Amino acid sequence: MTDKFDANDETRTVYAVVYDNDQPVSTGQFLAETKIEARLTRIVTLADYCGCGYGAKVTEALETYTRREGFYQLTIHSELTAQTFYENLGYQTYGSKYLEDGEYCQSLVKTILKWEKNMDIAMLIAIVGGLLGCYLYLTKNNEPKD
C-alpha cells in the first residue's frame, strides 16, 4: 500500500485505514479542494480482502469526517471498475468518461449535508425570528384605540 501515497500526504491529507491485526488492508484519503468541496482519493483494498466491506467502511469514515468538518460535497475520480461500488454508496456520475494514468475513469459526486453542522445556528435564527414576529404582532394589537 505504500505506493498509494503522494506529495499531498504530509500537508493536507486525512486518512482512514482498516487494519487486520497490524496489517493495513484498506485505506482512503480525504483532500479539501475548497471550503465547501472535498475529494476522496486512493481508496484501495488489498485483493485478499476485497468483498469484505472494508472499502465501504473507509469511504463512510471519510464521509463522516467530511460532514463533521462542514464540507458540502465530495467528489471521487473513479476507475470504471469501481464506479458501481461508489454508486451503491450514493454517489452520482457527472461529466464524461476520461483517461487518467492509463485507466478509464468517471467522476462522481455526493452531497454531504453541511446543514447538520450549522443546524443550531439556523434553529436559533428561526426562534429569534419567530419571537420577534410574535412581539411585533402583540405590540401592534395591544396599542390603544382612539
Curated annotation (Swiss-Prot):
Record-level Gene Ontology MF annotations: acyltransferase activity, transferring groups other than amino-acyl groups
Record carries keyword Transferase: yes
EC nos: 2.3.1.-
Keyword Signal tagged: no
N-acetyltransferase domain boundaries: 1-120
Keywords recorded for this protein, A-Z: Acyltransferase, Transferase
Cited InterPro entries: Acyl_CoA_acyltransferase, GNAT_dom
Family under the similarity heading: Belongs to the acetyltransferase family.
Name of the featured protein: Uncharacterized acetyltransferase in arcA 3'region
Lineage: Bacteria, Bacillati, Bacillota, Bacilli, Lactobacillales
